[in-house]
Amino acid sequence: MVNDKARRSVIQFEDVSFEYSGAETDSIHHISLDVKEGEFLVLTGGSGCGKTTLTRLVNGLGEQFYEGTLKGRITLLGRNISEYPLYEIGKKVGSIFQDPKSQFFASITEDEISFGCENYGVPYEELDRRVSSAIKRINGDMLRGKEIYPISSGEKQKIAVASVNAVDPEIYVFDEPSANLDMYSVEALKNLMGGLKAEGHTIIVAEHRLYYLTDLADRFLYMENGSIKEEWTAGELRSIPEEKRRAIGIRAADLHHIEVDISPVKEKDMTMEVKDLAFSYRKHPVFHDVSFQAYAGDLIAIVGHNGIGKTTLSNILCGMQKEKEGQIIYNGTKVSKCKRKNFAYFVMQNTDCQLFGDSVEEELLLNGKGSTQEQRDDLLKLYGLFEWKERHPATLSGGQKQRLTLAVSDWIDTPVLILDEPTSGLDFKNMMRISEHLKALAQKGKTILIITHDYEFAAMTCNRVLHFVDEGHVETFPLQENLSRLYSCLMCQ
């Protein structure tokens, strides 16, 4: 590796603080940072610690798009970043956001990938080459020519990465890039990042999941309350004692040291039975002959590759979509689509679709009429949201929004609770908080189904696995003594 002193600085923060309009305190404060050309930097820390704000300042959005006050100086490639027009920063700094839909402009995958190049006037022949190369990098041949809306969240994330890759900026900024990806796709993302690093690109990643970055990152910066508190190499990160890692709330650096943290549930009353379920989208089969049973107290991890139909199955179970064939039986009775909402509640992956209040507390009031102030406060404290009770949900971080939707689900007393990627955007502390709460609900007899790609979370939370092997075939197995099988299921998707 070239000595840092011999490499030019591409990004410099000099005593930088930033406060969003309406906020009582700075989101980040007194940050001083020097990022060298070709460096791979990872920002980690608890939800709301300032990681996303720091990335917004690197790509120019913090000062030029979001309302707020910036103090200090940010230098990008030798110039004060405030001197650049935003479109010029976009050529130099490519951004992949936590919610990929927020950066889409086209309805077809290849149109989206080419959109940035077209805006910068890239000649057609070169544009076609870049688009093909970007699709190859994300292993996305199956996504060519597809409409963006119906593809899965993980596939949307891939398209976002490809669209930035086609522009070929010098600096890449990723905000929680693995949040919606299965483990196989995370490996593909890792390889993509490794290729970018080998080409000399500077890469900044804000991330909770760290295991896939330890072979790539030059530095890990741990943030807390808007400040950089610690800095580690990959070796130092792996050497952090388990007690300290849990205390500061960071994810595992090595998945092979994770153990099952839940006992098998003794078979109780059957809550739900699915028989020969089939579904098609625009005459294209999504799955068929899906059958399984779920019991009171079950915590079932639903796994399978992106786009195989896990979310569609959940939509059908709670009455938001109708199956083509098959039966869904709750408590021994076949239930029609319109009545399923009384039996199953679905916490969606896209939390914005379920948040309607003008404040965090009002969100609870909309769903918990008749609740007392003490009950609402206790629930917000349980999910670590009490100090944000007056904040508008739109101003929360991704992890905070996720916890709010879970808090709302507590008011809805259905025998079955279904969650779609509940740990997306969560740090270790909040992942543990969610895990312990779901286990407490299961102990009370609730049946819980969790769509997840998160091996660490599934190992500490679930007792059974429902694996979509391929379209039309599922298998179930107990997680106890089958942890390696779960790992294989997630890695071979």
Regions from the PLM with identified roles:
Residues 44-46, 303-305:
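The feature captures the beta-strand-to-loop junction immediately N-terminal to the Walker
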Residues 59, 318:
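Helix-to-loop junction immediately C-terminal to a conserved catalytic motif
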Residues 207-208, 452-453:
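H-loop/switch region of ABC-family ATPase nucleotide-binding domains
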Residues 172-175, 417-420:
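Catalytic Walker B motif of ABC-type/P-loop ATPase nucleotide-binding domains
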Residues 147-151, 155, 392-396:
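Conserved ABC ATPase signature
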Residues 125-143, 373-388:
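Conserved ABC ATPase "signature" region
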Residues 67-79, 326-340:
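Conserved ABC transporter NBD signature motif
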